[in-house]
Amino acid sequence: MLSASRTALRAPRSVRGLATASLTKDSQVNQNLLESHSFINYKKHLENVEIVKSRLNRPLTYAEKLLYGHLDDPHNQEIERGVSYLKLRPDRVACQDATAQMAILQFMSAGIPQVATPSTVHCDHLIQAQVGGPKDLARAIDLNKEVYDFLSTACAKYNLGFWKPGSGIIHQIVLENYAFPGALLIGTDSHTPNAGGLGQLAIGVGGADAVDVMSGLPWELKAPKIIGVKLTGKMSGWTSPKDIILKLAGITTVKGGTGSIVEYFGSGVDTFSCTGMGTICNMGAEIGATTSVFPFNDSMVDYLNATGRSEIAQFAQVYKKDFLSADEGAEYDQVIEIDLNTLEPHINGPFTPDLATPVSKMKETAIANGWPLEVKVGLIGSCTNSSYEDMTRAASIIKDAGAHGLKSKALYTVSPGSEQVRATIARDGQLKTFEDFGGVVMANACGPCIGQWDRQDIKKGDKNTIVSSFNRNFTARNDGNPATHAFVASPEMATVYAISGDLGFNPITDTLVGADGKEFKLKEPQGVGLPPDGYDPGENTYQAPPEDRASVEVVISPTSDRLQKLSPFKPWDGKDAERLPILIKAVGKTTTDHISMAGPWLKYRGHLENISNNYMIGAINAENGKANEVRNHYTGKYDGVPQTAAAYRDAGHKWVVIGDENFGEGSSREHAALEPRFLGGFAIITKSFARIHETNLKKQGLLPLNFKNPADYDKINFDDEVDLIGLTTLAPGKDVILRVHPKEGEAWEAVLTHTFNSEQLEWFKHGSALNFIKSKY
């Protein structure tokens, strides 16, 4: 049986040829080193899969096996890709501190004594990068003490594991400790799919979904389509796993994966590391995918052994043929091929993660588009690229440059993904290499990746270029400056650009000038997938829930501006909606960053009233092309979006938002749905939605509706009033009629579609999913 240890984790000398005779399909194996009460249930999952296969009479993909293996009722569940809603039983829940506040507040209001599913909270989002790791961490602990105390005591009270500030980023902690092949995890962060690199189905959700699972209810997911990505060949030279997903994003665009799971297969999947697979799955969120996953293979065995989980590796090998691999002849809804032999490094951006440019074309493309060629900052790390392998490859480039007397031309920052990675690279020397290079090592946290960056080297409005190994590069996301041209690349390329200071530099063909005045080419990066001397766990930052939880008190000050107990939303009044004003007609990309900004607003994630003051302040108003300036329908005066929404609410007027395509893409933050509900919103009407945001809106009792004819979006004016007709007879698959009343001229009608099923309609009728849950208890 697995047991925890704080000593260095050493990989066995032979990590792949482990005998499996000691384990059988009936063996009892813990899911992780930290919990003694949760076991891997491969046998039950396989039984479910066999039931479904006998019903469907066809081979299954790996992703389908993991989904159907976790069905609540495999005998009677309707199963049709892209159509059915699946009722699933996840193995665990993971929450980061920014989204956990609202999730736990909702869980508390449900009145349930403890979580029914193993769950953890990870403190990674509230630490602002300023001067460096230790000082930034100390400052964050002081500033956020009230929130950390709330989360710590709530976790102790309700039986959740708690990872303290400084422990690392949620996805890296999950990969190191909780992920295992064949599992189903939901997490309140859009990059939860990172764990797909360890053969796990990991899906980002809103806090209300997490509350369902923590409460012991089945979790609902629309049966995804399956996109197969066939990898052939082998990467070499400057190419890294990050380039696979950067290339794929350019092929599919930011919405090409919507409603689908991306499953990787082919001979190429066995040619790189488990952590590299995690990088690829992590950024699958940027193409809208429900999740991404790799099938169980030897690289995963290596990683499990290196992280002290050899028993799980052996147990997975017992089930590899029947459960942890795709069936021969399994069919995908779409297949995309990528030849790793010919893949070159890519740089994606600016302003969107799907604008992919190969390094060989970067200089001419940048010049043609007027992108600033001088690279001001190179940033590596984050949840996407902070593995030991990433760090060693970046360090090898720096050592080569240093041998020629060069240091970083740009500001260079390193965000370690976890305390374990930080401690290991400190022991093995890479950390010193970064510091000698001129790099600033940040806290083990999200930092600049999510806008937690107090950037001082430029003024807001200054046009400049930064290159990171992060996953997302929306306008103003990293530093709050809309003029910053942010590009996403591998850690290797971000490091190269920091050395050269030139976005047009190609390390494959171009030379640098050393301190001696001689030209030289950088050597290809070298690195190792796993530390030869094992991982150093560093400081113990985990708080296990106590055995006696009855005496634990969770205190929320009634005067707090950070935390606020929730009041239930009112149920639907049972009537069609008439003469609703349009709060804003948003034009162009409207991500969750536009809807509910992060950065300085993160501190209000536990206080719905205060954070609602950021609602839609980044969205562009189609009337005037401005952000956060809309006209009050009744007074004619201009004001901010949240102020106008609150004025409508206080005057008793429901309102709607009109949105463009892929509305709500980006993070999983449910505040982007809680805020419009709190401010009196009734419906969000768009050309199309991103999956998580659409579900979050439903959970909070709002109506997410789509134009059946997208051209109707263009016909609506900001000063129109609208009716929503057919709500009293609303049913799955039944359209809603939008009657538009222009300020001048005749009324006209448009057809709106929706994706509600019967139970989701109950959420709307009751006022929220939480209200519906409480009505059943």
UniProtKB/Swiss-Prot annotation:
Pathway: Carbohydrate metabolism; tricarboxylic acid cycle; isocitrate from oxaloacetate: step 2/2. The keyword Metal-binding applies. It is found in: Mitochondrion. Substrate binds at Q96, D189, S190, H191, R472, R477, R605, S668, R669. Keywords: 4Fe-4S, Iron, Iron-sulfur, Lyase, Metal-binding, Mitochondrion, Transit peptide, Tricarboxylic acid cycle. InterPro entries: Acnase/IPM_dHydase_lsu_aba_1/3, Acoase/IPM_deHydtase_lsu_aba, Aconitase/3IPM_dehydase_swvl, Aconitase/IPM_isomerase, Aconitase_4Fe-4S_BS, Aconitase_4Fe-4S_dom, Aconitase_dom2, Aconitase_mito-like. SUPFAM superfamilies: Aconitase iron-sulfur domain, LeuD/IlvD-like. GO terms for biological process: mitochondrial genome maintenance; symbiont-mediated perturbation of host immune response; tricarboxylic acid cycle. Binds 1 [4Fe-4S] cluster per subunit. Its cofactor is [4Fe-4S] cluster. GO terms for cellular component: cytosol; fungal biofilm matrix; mitochondrial nucleoid; mitochondrion. Transmembrane segments: none annotated. Its EC number is 4.2.1.3. Signal peptide: none annotated. Pfam families: Aconitase (PF00330), Aconitase_C (PF00694). [4Fe-4S] cluster binds at C383, C446, C449. It catalyses: citrate = D-threo-isocitrate. GO terms for molecular function: 4 iron, 4 sulfur cluster binding; aconitate hydratase activity; double-stranded DNA binding; metal ion binding; mRNA binding; single-stranded DNA binding. The keyword Protease does not apply. Belongs to the aconitase/IPM isomerase family. Catalyzes the isomerization of citrate to isocitrate via cis-aconitate, a step in the citric acid cycle. Monomer. This is Aconitate hydratase, mitochondrial. It comes from Candida albicans (strain SC5314 / ATCC MYA-2876) (Yeast).
